[in-house]
Swiss-Prot record:
SMART domains: PDGF. It is found in: Secreted. CDD domains: PDGF. This is Snake venom vascular endothelial growth factor toxin. Residues 119-146 are annotated as: Disordered. InterPro entries: Cystine-knot_cytokine, PD_growth_factor_CS, PDGF/VEGF_dom, PDGF/VEGF_growth_factor. Homodimer; disulfide-linked. Interacts with VEGF receptor-1 (FLT1) with a high affinity, whereas it binds to VEGF receptor-2 (KDR) with a low affinity. Does not bind VEGF receptor-3 (FLT4). GO terms for biological process: induction of positive chemotaxis; positive regulation of angiogenesis; positive regulation of endothelial cell proliferation; positive regulation of mast cell chemotaxis; response to hypoxia; sprouting angiogenesis; vascular endothelial growth factor receptor signaling pathway; vascular endothelial growth factor signaling pathway. Its main location: secreted. Disulfide bonds join C38-C80, C69-C115, C73-C117. Residues 133-146 have a biased composition (Basic and acidic residues). Expressed by the venom gland.
Amino acid sequence: MAAYLLAVAILFCIQGWPLGTVQGQVMPFMEVYRHSVCQTRETLVSILEEHPDEVSHIFRPSCVTALRCGGCCTDESLKCTATGKRSVGREIMRVDPHKGTSKTEVMQFTEHTDCECRPRSASGVNSRKHKRNPEEGEPRAKFPFV
């Protein structure tokens, strides 16, 4: 992977900026690529989706930030998946609309610590791959490995 990134960086330097663009107005390829890869990233997580048993209360804020896996894999048969997790606390305000009371408290949320591209489940993309005729061979890799 490092060799590929180096080769792309060298190619980009040789070719220079695309005509008609000004540095700063267009995000360079390597930066776009670096931001798109499978990695942990700050994500907004709904408190009620994370704690569905708490529907009788109102929370402020209604969502919190947590690191979650996201991004693209080099093959559509792969999915960016969490390989490490931890529990983190976030201080929120719990409002009880029936009693008209509120209090701050710490709630626990799952945060991803490590991510990697792993095969998707048997449904979707992989199921198409399994139905291929053996004479067809494997599908050709898509960009950036064309």
